[in-house]
């Protein structure tokens, strides 16, 4: 403890300093032991004074040296922070897949296109439909389904170096950031109805569709005409990819059945699940009635979600038997009309998307150069090359002429000297 206290500066230990001050007056008040001690102490005092003087002189010399020799060091010390301030700050690192992003561009990560439907995921189609409906600038990232969000999901977006996952959270965050509220014209009661209906669509009807897909994986590939070679970006033939797809899908079937049972829908029979789906479609049909959209003449968030889910049924190939799709076509024709209206409003490039499987058909492409333009450009280049070659030849001729003149003048001078 004594050594630790000794290392602490005096201003940090006020108790020690006070104790030393209290001892000093006691020492001065004490009388000398005898009179002989005073003369003996005098030389010691003189020596101490001489030593103190030498110390003071030494300290003064040190101070002079410091003033003379250490002033440049102080200047350097002062200049050092200025140099550090002028240095550029390190570049900010973003934990995103697309590091060369443009500011305020929404980068959407989703599944690949199919010939019948822009996306096999109702959640991905929901986000892209909403982005198109509100008019926000976005770009699909062709990642060949390699990436997932930090939550392990698709879709997710990246905006200004930040990741946002889950379709509901994406729409909520973007609505707040850009003030794009599709439900601003709804009453409180209508918003409550919308919220409850969206919950039915996403937490009940979608799971009924997923149950059918998990049970019949072959029908998923055939029903939507999925090209795995294009979707995965692989060169293997589709026959081999389809074979491996069945194996991997068979393994995931057990995981899927566990999820379906945990959800609750998977504990029922196929007939019971089908009836649940028909009841959901009937409720939606009665809500829509004869209106163009669920709450009037303009689409809202409920219309976006309903379109994304019902499209999974409506655009399934007629070659594949699916009772739930047939029920919607026969018993709920107004839902078919709703899907068509949303498609025309949000996806005018639907045919181009499905034929070319283009993720970014909505982004204008640069016009290809015509043959005439290419020929004209080639002629201009050839003319420029000919011009440069002609200039070189002229310069060489001028040099030859100047050399001839110099040689003739030199010969004349030699003759004159002779």
UniProtKB/Swiss-Prot annotation:
GO BP annotation list: axonogenesis; female germ-line stem cell population maintenance
Composition skew (Low complexity), residue ranges: 9-19, 28-45
Keyword Heme: no
Positions of the UniProt region annotated as Disordered: 1-95, 361-418
Protein keywords: Developmental protein
Record-linked Pfam families: GST_C_6 (PF17171), GST_N_4 (PF17172)
A cellular component term, taken from the record's GO annotations: plasma membrane
Gene3D superfamilies registered for this protein in UniProt: 1.20.1050.10, Glutaredoxin
InterPro entries according to UniProt: FAX/IsoI-like, Glutathione-S-Trfase_C_sf, Glutathione_S-Trfase, Metaxin_GST, Mito_Protein_Transport_Metaxin, Thioredoxin-like_fold, Thioredoxin-like_sf
Family under the similarity heading: Belongs to the FAX family.
Biological role: Together with Abl, involved in embryonic axonal development.
Name recorded for this polypeptide: Failed axon connections
């Amino acid at each position: 403890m004594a050594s630790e206290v000794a290392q602490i500066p005096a201003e940090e230990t006020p108790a020690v300093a006070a104790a030393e001050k209290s001892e000093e007056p006691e020492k001065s008040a004490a009388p000398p032991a005898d009179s002989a001690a005073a003369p003996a102490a005098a030389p010691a005092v003189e020596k101490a004074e001489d030593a103190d003087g030498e110390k003071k002189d030494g300290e003064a010399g040190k101070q002079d040296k410091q003033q003379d020799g250490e002033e440049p060091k102080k200047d350097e010390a002062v200049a050092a922070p200025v140099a550090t301030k002028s240095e550029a700050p390190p570049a900010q690192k973003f934990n995103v897949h697309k590091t060369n992003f443009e500011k305020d561009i929404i980068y959407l990560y989703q599944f690949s296109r199919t010939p019948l439907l822009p996306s096999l995921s109702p959640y991905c189609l929901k986000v892209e439909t909403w982005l198109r409906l509100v008019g926000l600038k976005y770009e699909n990232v062709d990642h060949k389904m390699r990436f997932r969000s930090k939550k392990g999901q698709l879709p997710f977006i990246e905006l200004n170096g930040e990741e946002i996952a889950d379709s509901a959270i994406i729409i909520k965050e973007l609505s707040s950031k850009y003030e794009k509220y599709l439900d601003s014209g709804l009453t409180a009661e209508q918003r409550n109805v919308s919220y409850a209906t969206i919950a039915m669509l996403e937490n009940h009807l979608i799971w009924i569709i997923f149950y059918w897909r998990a049970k019949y994986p072959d029908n998923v590939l055939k029903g939507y005409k999925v090209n795995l070679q294009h979707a995965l970006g692989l060169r293997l033939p589709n026959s081999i990819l389809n074979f491996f797809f069945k194996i991997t899908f068979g393994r995931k079937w057990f995981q899927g059945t566990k999820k379906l049972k945990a959800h609750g829908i998977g504990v029922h029979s196929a007939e019971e699940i089908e009836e649940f789906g028909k009841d959901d479609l009937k409720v939606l049909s009665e809500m829509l009635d004869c209106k163009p959209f669920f709450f009037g003449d303009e689409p809202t968030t409920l219309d976006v979600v309903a379109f994304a889910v019902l499209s999974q049924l409506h655009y399934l190939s007629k070659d594949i038997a699916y009772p739930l799709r047939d029920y919607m076509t026969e018993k709920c024709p107004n839902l078919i009309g709703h899907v068509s209206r949303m498609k025309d409003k949000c996806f005018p490039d639907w045919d181009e998307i499905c034929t070319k499987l283009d993720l970014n058909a909505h982004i204008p492409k640069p016009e290809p150069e015509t043959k005439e333009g290419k020929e004209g450009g080639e002629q201009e280049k050839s003319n420029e090359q000919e011009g440069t070659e002609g200039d070189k030849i002229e310069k060489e001729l001028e040099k030859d002429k100047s050399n001839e003149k110099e040689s003739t003048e030199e010969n004349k001078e030699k003759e004159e000297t002779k």
